[in-house]
Amino acid sequence: MAELVLKTDFPDLKLAGRGKVRDIYDLGDALLIVTTDRISAFDVIMNEAIPDKGYVLTQISSFWFRQMEDIIPNHIISTDVKDFPAECQKYAAQLEGRSMLVKKAKPLPVECIVRGYISGSGWKDYKATGAICGITLPAGLVESDKLEEPIFTPSTKAELGEHDENISFDKCVELIGRELAEKIRDVTIAIYKRARDIADTKGIIIADTKFEYGIYNGELIIIDECMTPDSSRFWPKDSYKPGGAQPSFDKQFLRDYLETLDWGKTAPAPPLPEEIVRKTGEKYMEALVRLTGKGK
């Protein structure tokens, strides 16, 4: 099995920050994003590494970014370590397969969530109010139902350890202006529809997903990750049955385990049994194999 990477430490490179999963290095006119094997749930980072998770996320993101280039440009300069600047080469073994050299964009202060099915926080909102992010939905929907049309439900971008807050489209307009808000809404739904159709041919339902965008040289581009098991709900099509939660190829498996514990969903995280770690890794790898036809 490949070496597990919980955290990178590259003394010759300038660390710009660590997110829940990614370590980001500032290379001057570009960023180096290294996707570790960390996993978070309920905005808390677990103590254990998930085997090959960083590899899976990077490969799935690359796959989707390529599929969407005619809809919107993305931030990737290269995912081939040989193309990275000279100062990165001594770390090639750790970077291989889990890193991206990317453009330095100015991130927009909203996360762009699109939902094709009703699940997760959307289902909770609907049960309480009959709506999600101010969008009224038909009465009588059940958990995991397919929506007639995908809906755009943005959220704020919280600081590490805080929770994102769902916001209305009008609030999104307040934050970034109407023209940009309409553009990211339309692009988000267009990407989702194409991905949904591609995934459908591979036996996967993409129930919902989230994107981040930035401005680079005055142009809107998609940044961060693209439809990975961290940012999306992937369900097996062959066992889809509305009326309850669905089995999944994402971290829902981990969330479901954590829900059985007497844990307050705040740091420190509880220890994870070896079987949960292994099975979570297998679910991530299965998503990669199903989508791209290639494992590791």
Curated annotation (Swiss-Prot):
Q: Which reaction does it catalyse?
A: 5-amino-1-(5-phospho-D-ribosyl)imidazole-4-carboxylate + L-aspartate + ATP = (2S)-2-[5-amino-1-(5-phospho-beta-D-ribosyl)imidazole-4-carboxamido]succinate + ADP + phosphate + 2 H(+)
Enzyme nomenclature, EC number: 6.3.2.6
* Molecular function GO labels: ATP binding; phosphoribosylaminoimidazolesuccinocarboxamide synthase activity
Q: Does the keyword ATP-binding apply?
A: yes
List this protein's GO terms for biological process. 'de novo' IMP biosynthetic process
Superkingdom of the organism of origin: Bacteria
What family is this?
Answer: Belongs to the SAICAR synthetase family.
Q: Which PANTHER family match?
A: PHOSPHORIBOSYLAMINOIMIDAZOLE-SUCCINOCARBOXAMIDE SYNTHASE
According to UniProt, the name of this protein is Phosphoribosylaminoimidazole-succinocarboxamide synthase
